[in-house]
Amino acid sequence: MNICVVSTFEGDVEEFMSMVAEFDEEIKEAASTIEFGVVNTDKVGFSKIITIANITNEERFQGIMSSPRMIEWDKAHNNTDVIYSIEKIS
């Protein structure tokens, strides 16, 4: 299943990428590919990341997204994730 996650949060992109690095092994168990794009918000202190991933283990992915560490990070950074299911066309 291909997904797009739009994450909007208070903090720097580096903080987000550091958090993702903490989940590196778990992500490898849940996704065959994952890519990140940075969106310029033009707002000091606010960041937006677009993540595209091919999820191969939905249960594992859900476990990552709802883990205590992830929830703690989300709360600390006032993060909002909007998740879309996407279909590859070509």
For the regions a protein language model found, what residue spans apply to each?
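Regulatory input/activation interfaces that engage signals or partners
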Residues: 76
